[in-house]
Amino acid sequence: MTRHLIFAAMLLVCLFVCWNAVGARDARSAFSLEETAQDEHVMEERVFINPAGNREKNACLENCKSLPNCKNYEFCSK
């Protein structure tokens, strides 16, 4: 009888640990999706605040400036 109780307790502990692991993974993915949505919103605001100009070219220049070995912006004019 004692063995059965120990087995049942271990089974419940395993179920609890697995359930929490799945819940934590779902929470992390939900947080990641929310973070991505916020990043997209910031980019939209940045494009909106930036007056006139070519949006693609501005984004290209920003990306190029962040690269350490970018010497010129010729490819941005395409």
Curated annotation (Swiss-Prot):
The keyword Transmembrane does not apply. The keyword Signal applies. It is found in: Secreted. Disulfide bonds: none annotated. Expressed by the venom gland. Residues 1-24 form the signal peptide. Contains 2 disulfide bonds. It comes from the Eukaryota. One of its GO terms (cellular component) is extracellular region. Residues 25-28 form a propeptide. Keywords: Disulfide bond, Secreted, Signal, Toxin. One of its GO terms (molecular function) is toxin activity. Belongs to the scoloptoxin-04 family. This is U-scoloptoxin(04)-Er1e. It comes from Ethmostigmus rubripes.
